[in-house]
Amino acid sequence: MPPSAHWGKRPRSGDSEEAFVRFSELSPAAKMERRREERGEKKERERTLAYFKSVQRALEEHGSGGGDAGALASIVDGFFSELLKLLKADSTFYVLRNGTACRVIELALTSALLLHVKSLLYVFLGHICDLMVSPVASFTLETLLAALSQGLSALGETNPEGLVAELTEGGVGTHVGSGVPSSATLVRSMADELCERAEDLIVHDIGGRALRSVVMMLGGRAIRQAPQPPHPVAFPDVLGTLAEAIMKALEDGYGREYNTANAAESWMAAVQAPATSLVVQSLLRVSDEGSVVDRCVRQRIEALSYKGKPLLHHLLVDPLGCHVFQSYVQVPPPAAVVEAGDMAAARATAAASPSVSSAAKASANEASTAEEFKGKEEGELLVPGGADSCCWSRAAELVLLEVDNLLKPGSDLVAQTGYVLQDLVLYAPATLHLQWLWRRLLSPRLLLLFDVPALTAVLVQAVKRCAFEGVLLRPTGLAAQLRDAAGSDAVSTATAAAEAQNEVSHHGTVLPADVLSMLRKEAALHVRYSPVPIAFQSAVCARVCELAKQRAAKGAAQYLLVDGALSEKGHEVARYLMHLHPSASKLLQHSLDKLQREDLVAVVCHQKGSQFMQQYIKVAALATPTSAATAGDNAGDAKGPLMRLFRRLQSSLSTLIYDKYAAFMVETLYECASLGVKEALVKALVPIYQDMRKLSPSAGVAGAPAASEDGVEHAPQEPATAEEGEAAGNAEVASPSPTQQRFIAYKVMSRCCVEQYVHRKEDWTKLALRQCQVQQLLRRMLLSE
């Protein structure tokens, strides 16, 4: 481990030249002088700490909106001036041993200018390794690197020439008169210090964590849970130098420590140490094709063999080495592999008919799609493009050969194999690879995915990967299109809602807030949802529903939502199946009609069951003809899925409107339904509303909670976005109080415009008709995107 003799024990000036003398052996005058010095140092430390605390209060006050930007900039600038003076005057950096001082520096770095960040890093040079192993200062160094990355990203947006100057090693950067060199020069000097002590850092718990942050920052990735910069800035040359030093330290250090016979044994010893293993995983995550990191880490792993088998095989079957294998799976594939896979998927989609209506046509399309990547590989176990095409292909082929041994009864490797399979699903380079993985690995072992709880998450990820295929995580053009389409009040309201909520559409429906948040987090981890043909989506849904029907007489809905065989994962599988293309999830939609009414009510009153039902209502509304949506007495509307759902739940409405989960479903039903279903629902709610008025005459829809209270219990606009709030409310174990239940019920009445229907029916009809027209306009626009 790195020596820490000078860290935590401040050497006094002249200690190295003077012989050690006990305090008791000093003369009375020397004792008085020593005590006077200690009192002075203590007072100085107290004054310094008081200054840091005052800066902290000022920064927190301005951070909460209590001051203007100019005052905040002045505070930060003055603080860094004092901090740099303090650090330059004390070569031991004694102040950085205080946790409060370090937290204040981290807080100031969030509002610091690029010059402040560079100046602080410039002062740190020469002490980087000591800071890396410090329990508190290491976090400050990580925050400093994150601020440097954010500052360079912002500079690239406003001043591209300045960014080029900052990335020039040996240059002066953009701050010519400051005496601080360019960012690339500072980062290179920092990396040189780390290379000298790499052998010590990779085995140090704190130093290893800080070293991972350095690796991620040099690779252009976010660290310390900071948001990913819009224009990441990487230092590939510096990263390559550091990676070479780390790999040399790994093989030499562990080889010397364990007296290993070859480099492969050193690797196997290294992956048993969590600190070293995590550093290797970080290097794999920032490995790009053709880079130095790719050559010295990824290619090195592939080239080594141990006991007659590839090193990758031993990493797969090792409980700790499996984590390195997962990071190997996540290595970004070459652009050529991704492009070829997308082109094959595009050809399959173009060959398919616009509407997949018959099972025979779906099977034919699936067969033709499979034929594209089977070809000469028929009867072989080769992955698309061959095992050498990318890391994912090599790992998938190895897993296919070993999966039966890994998943055999009594194996201790089932759980870790489940995590590997999840990564294979999520990080499949293209649809071509995902189809191969489903056909060769997952579909033949679907029984295991159903029966083994540790593997059920693999099924969830596979369905999710198909459901959100090709999703674009950007605001839809909904608001702009609506603004140009018409100028009515209803359209203006919809436009404002779309702009405020930053919605994203997929398969004709707006993605719920919790799903959108999940997808954004996965996108930050470089998970790519490539386009998936509808035929393949249909095949996945049919296979899951077929197996579920064998276990439940009433079909997949009964097995996934009611029987609880898959626990909470069953609701997730069902919900993601409902996010497939509407024509691909027909089997699950039809199985919902077979549920008993009591079971359907139980599903609606469950949190994840309510989320599933909300998505089902949105999908079912897509099948409603335009004429039926605006005609209250249309004969076809009476046989529609939403009317059937309403009739089955009509007798339970007096209970459902008081349930915090079922209430969202009722609101979604009113919002998405056609005019006939809207009126039938409101008519059923009128007697309940009148009874509520009789029980509490002073209460009413006008007494519904305000917007601030609304945000706690329900989302103010789209019911689907309320799922994010419900996830937070799920922590409450106790059932809602009577006051909360009345709040929920009046919220439902308000959203369904029951009071308006009672007193001004003509106005309600006009409003409902306008809502139906807007819904149809929204669906057409979403489907056209």
Labelled PLM ranges:
Residues P2-E785:
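Eukaryotic gene-expression regulator signature that favors modular helical reader/repeat domains
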